[in-house]
From Swiss-Prot:
<dbReference type="GO" id="GO:0090090">
    <property type="term" value="P:negative regulation of canonical Wnt signaling pathway"/>
</dbReference>
<dbReference type="GO" id="GO:0003700">
    <property type="term" value="F:DNA-binding transcription factor activity"/>
</dbReference>
<dbReference type="GO" id="GO:0055014">
    <property type="term" value="P:atrial cardiac muscle cell development"/>
</dbReference>
<comment type="subunit">
    <text>Homodimer (via the homeobox); binds DNA as homodimer. Interacts (via the homeobox) with TBX5 (via the T-box); this complex binds DNA. Interacts with HIPK1 and HIPK2, but not HIPK3. Interacts with the C-terminal zinc finger of GATA4 through its homeobox domain. Also interacts with JARID2 which represses its ability to activate transcription of ANF. Interacts with FBLIM1. Interacts with TBX18. Interacts with histone methyltransferase NSD2 (via HMG box). Interacts with NEDD9. Interacts with TBX1.</text>
</comment>
<dbReference type="GO" id="GO:0008284">
    <property type="term" value="P:positive regulation of cell population proliferation"/>
</dbReference>
<dbReference type="GO" id="GO:0060048">
    <property type="term" value="P:cardiac muscle contraction"/>
</dbReference>
<dbReference type="GO" id="GO:0060929">
    <property type="term" value="P:atrioventricular node cell fate commitment"/>
</dbReference>
<protein>
    <recommendedName>
        <fullName>Homeobox protein Nkx-2.5</fullName>
    </recommendedName>
</protein>
<dbReference type="GO" id="GO:0001947">
    <property type="term" value="P:heart looping"/>
</dbReference>
<dbReference type="GO" id="GO:0003682">
    <property type="term" value="F:chromatin binding"/>
</dbReference>
<dbReference type="GO" id="GO:0060037">
    <property type="term" value="P:pharyngeal system development"/>
</dbReference>
<dbReference type="GO" id="GO:0001570">
    <property type="term" value="P:vasculogenesis"/>
</dbReference>
<dbReference type="GO" id="GO:0003007">
    <property type="term" value="P:heart morphogenesis"/>
</dbReference>
<dbReference type="GO" id="GO:1904036">
    <property type="term" value="P:negative regulation of epithelial cell apoptotic process"/>
</dbReference>
<dbReference type="GO" id="GO:0007512">
    <property type="term" value="P:adult heart development"/>
</dbReference>
<dbReference type="GO" id="GO:0032993">
    <property type="term" value="C:protein-DNA complex"/>
</dbReference>
<dbReference type="GO" id="GO:0055013">
    <property type="term" value="P:cardiac muscle cell development"/>
</dbReference>
Length: 324
């Protein structure tokens, strides 16, 4: 059997590779711890101004976790050993607590913190102002004019609606007012007149026209119905002027001697009582002696001369009338 060759340490063994990973992890943890420690020990100036200054009691009292961090850093291997074991591997050196971080400028961090604090204070102030009710602006009291002042202003306004500056100053001095008060009064008065004219114009335009007079109702008799005259057959109508037609009383005339009174009916028919007349052979003599003739109204119309027009043709429709 051949003797085993001497074991020479090589940087590529499993143990060396595992040790390398552990060393890298420990170095990363050390860098993170150093960053935390630096943030704990170096607060910003804005934060320091917000708190009361206290007496310094040492790094252990200021940072409670400082001893544990130091113990962890002490157990970590030194960077020199790592560099000697792995010459080609990059070396990681833990930064001291007092060394500034080149990637982060402490002044920039302080500026950022101050800006954030100012923004927070500004938002808080705006919120307080929004919650607090705004004080209402106090209006100036209205100027109350006396009756004498108003009377004088109205009288001057009727004479002159626009005043120049000297005239306004003179009127103000007489009424013991300021020029501005007189000017404002005249402006308001002119505006009031303008509004009154506009209202009157609107009233005239919107006024409806007067209603027409009511139609007069006139009673008109029906003369023809279905092509036939219907004045005599129809019922008597009431005239528009309330003129009534009453039957004529024939008994008002004195009766002739030897004859009885005529008995008249409301239908315009009269029957007279005649004495015993002569024989039928002498009718003309008896008629001449008695001077009475019985005839109808239609016969009377026929006796009229043909030259005179018959204006009242409706008389012939009254039947049963006899005259003597």
């Amino acid at each position: 059997m051949f003797p085993s060759p001497a074991l020479t340490p090589t940087p590529f063994s499993v143990k060396d590779i595992l040790n390398l990973e552990q060393q890298q992890r420990s170095l990363a943890a050390a860098g993170e711890l150093s960053a935390r420690l630096e943030a704990t020990l170096a607060p910003s100036s804005c934060m320091l101004a917000a708190f009361k200054p206290e007496a310094y009691a040492g790094p252990e009292a200021a940072a409670p976790g400082l001893p544990e961090l130091r113990a962890e850093l002490g157990r970590a291997p030194s960077p020199a050993k790592c560099a000697s074991a792995f010459p080609a591997a990059p070396a990681f050196y833990p930064r001291a607590y007092s060394d500034p971080d080149p990637a982060k400028d402490p002044r920039a961090e302080k500026k950022e913190l101050c800006a954030l604090q100012k923004a927070v204070e500004l938002e808080k102030t705006e919120a307080d102002n929004a919650e607090r009710p705004r004080a209402r602006r106090r209006r100036k009291p209205r100027v109350l004019f006396s009756q004498a002042q108003v009377y004088e202003l109205e009288r001057r306004f009727k004479q002159q609606r626009y005043l120049s500056a000297p005239e306004r100053d003179q009127l103000a001095s007489v009424l013991k007012l300021t020029s501005t008060q007189v000017k404002i009064w005249f402006q308001n008065r002119r505006y009031k007149c303008k509004r009154q004219r506009q209202d009157q114009t609107l009233e005239l335009v919107g006024l409806p026209p007067p209603p027409p007079p009511p139609a007069r109702r006139i009673a008109v008799p029906v003369l023809v119905r279905d092509g036939k005259p219907c004045l005599g057959d129809s019922a008597p109508y009431a005239p528009a002027y309330g003129v009534g037609l009453n039957p004529y009383g024939y008994n008002a005339y004195p009766a002739y001697p030897g004859y009885g009174g005529a008995a008249c009916s409301p239908g315009y028919s009269c029957t007279a009582a005649y004495p015993a007349g002569p024989s039928p052979a002498q009718p003309a003599t008896a008629a001449a002696n008695n001077n009475f003739v019985n005839f109808g109204v239609g016969d009377l119309n026929a006796v009229q001369s043909p030259g005179i027009p018959q204006s009242n043709s409706g008389v012939s429709t009254l039947h049963g009338i006899r005259a003597w």
